[in-house]
Regions:
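Glycine-rich phosphate-binding loop of ATP-dependent small-molecule kinases
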Residues: 1-64, 75, 190-203
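Hydrophobic "anchor" residues on beta-strands that sit immediately upstream
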Residues: 3, 26-28, 108-109, 123, ...
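Residue-level signal for inorganic ion chemistry
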Residues: 13, 32, 83, 111, ...
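An amphipathic alpha-helix signature
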Residues: 24, 46-50, 136-141, 151, ...
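Well-ordered beta-strand positions
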Residues: 27, 33, 128, 172-173
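ATP-dependent small-molecule kinase phosphotransfer cores
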Residues: 36-108
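Small-molecule kinase domains that catalyze NTP-dependent phosphoryl transfer to phosphate-bearing small molecules
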Residues: 95, 124-125, 142-145, 149-196
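ATP-dependent NMP and nucleoside kinases share a basic, alpha-helical "lid"
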Residues: 95-105, 109-146
Length: 203
């Protein structure tokens, strides 16, 4: 089973690429979705996060107010690292369970969608890594359109991520989401075929 990693800085268009890959029949583990589940009502990280950061970050439904917590941790690197020390091991366990299930199902390939793939060492378990890029102007425009995003918060997030040039140097495939979507999608499909995956192209 081929393990493909997908990464890129915030708002580069990873979700679009992941959606295309999923449409092609490749199962995906989305680390952001895993985090949302862990911090949601009844999630596995809720109790420890509340113990470490305070009950005021809890919601009436039994989860974590991710926006308030995000505002808190991204303004203080030490707090961000503390949160990551709680959440990242749980995400890895979630991912490992997914991989084991896909191996048992004899999947030809899977995709690991991880914004901090290189930063967390997740690339070591991947056979291939796709890096998605976009211009600074494009990423800023997309990110600042998100609810609750500010320029200061965006700067803090970008500072916690590996620079794009370093990611490019470690990529097996680089996709530029500033290019026309059809061009990028065809580049992706061609590459998947090159690495030995049978892909049906829908024209």
């Amino acid at each position: 089973m081929k393990i493909i990693g997908l990464t890129g800085s915030i708002a580069t268009g990873k979700s679009t690429i992941a959606g295309w890959i999923n449409e092609l029949g490749i199962a995906i583990h989305d680390s952001d979705c895993a985090v949302h589940e862990l911090l949601g009502p009844g999630g596995g990280a809720v109790e420890e996060v509340l113990a470490q950061f305070g009950c005021h970050f809890g919601t009436i439904t039994g989860g974590i107010n991710r926006k308030s917590l995000g505002d808190e941790v991204f303004s203080t690197p030490q707090k961000r690292l503390k949160l990551e020390s709680i959440v990242h091991p749980m995400v890895r366990q979630h991912r490992d369970t997914f991989i084991a299930e896909q191996r048992r199902a004899r999947a030809a390939a899977i995709l690991l969608d991880v914004p901090l793939l290189f930063e967390t060492g997740g690339d070591a378990m991947c056979d291939y890594v796709i890096v998605v890029l976009a211009s600074a102007r494009t990423t800023a425009k997309r990110a600042l359109a998100r609810p609750g995003m500010t320029e200061d918060k965006l700067s803090s997030i970008l500072a916690s991520q590996m620079p794009s040039d370093e990611k490019k140097a470690r990529a097996d495939l680089i996709l530029d989401s500033d290019l026309p979507k059809d061009q990028t999608r065809n580049q992706l499909i061609d590459w998947l075929s090159v690495i030995g995956l049978s892909i049906v192209r829908n024209e």
